[in-house]
Amino acid sequence: MDDNWIVENLENALATWNEKLAEIWQLVSMTPQEFKGGGIWNIVVQINGALQAIGYGLLVLFFAMGLFKNTVNFQELRRPEAALRYFLHFVAAKAAVTYCMPLMLAVFDICGGVVSTVAGQMGGMAGDVGALPGEISAAIGNVGFLASIPLWLVTILGSLFITVRSFILIMTVYSRFFKLYLYTALAPVPIAAFGSSETAATGKAFLKGYVGVCLEGAVIVLSCLIFSAYMGSGSPAAPSGSAVSMVWTYVAEMIFNMLVLVGLVKGSDRIVREMMGL
């Protein structure tokens, strides 16, 4: 190993980080139909269609439960306005179950518009937010063999940490897609709860949860954009001193900044719930 290996190791770790940030932008701007060529989406559509029959059964059950609970006897149904109200309620709930797929896609498109607006107003994702400063490279190139041994340890640990954090970041974004698929596939069952006012809270909670998952993309994009702007405003300080102290300070500050971003991305669901009251 030599000094060039130390620089190359750090640059490779930062390149992996930049690559994962670019991949995040591609994922959050991608529709469920486009993800992985649409193969997963086709399965989700099939499951959604198969569960519609169960949704209709639950809809009738919930509607009957609400009807029997709210009408002591059927005298109330003799009034045209009461009968019309129950009829319209049932028709609206049935339409929600029948067209739950277009409903879910419409919600996703609206939230996707929020993501595009956020990115568009701020100029999109930055290209390379992490680049090794020239003074760090120069300091590493000037050290001798014995002095470079501590640098090997620092760069190995720092590079490993940066690489692991970059994969944690991308795994969090991938998990959002899987949550979108789960919500969409199972949609007919919880939406059938709108058949009765007593069970409608379940349907409302489901839709709120789905909106929250969709809006996670906006929080993720905004977090990455703020991180990119922060890193673009200047590299972490590289104070004068030994090469080991300079590299250690640089790596420590980079790791701290990355930890903040990873924490925001992983907590995007909690942030959305707190902001939107979901």
What are the residue ranges of the model-derived segments?
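Binding/recognition "hotspot" determinant
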Residues: 1-58
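Short amphipathic alpha-helical coupling elements at transmembrane boundaries
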Residues: 26, 82-89, 116, 120, ...
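Alpha-helical transmembrane segments
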Residues: 191-208, 240, 271-275
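Hydrophobic transmembrane alpha-helix segments characteristic of membrane transport
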Residues: 58-94, 186-200
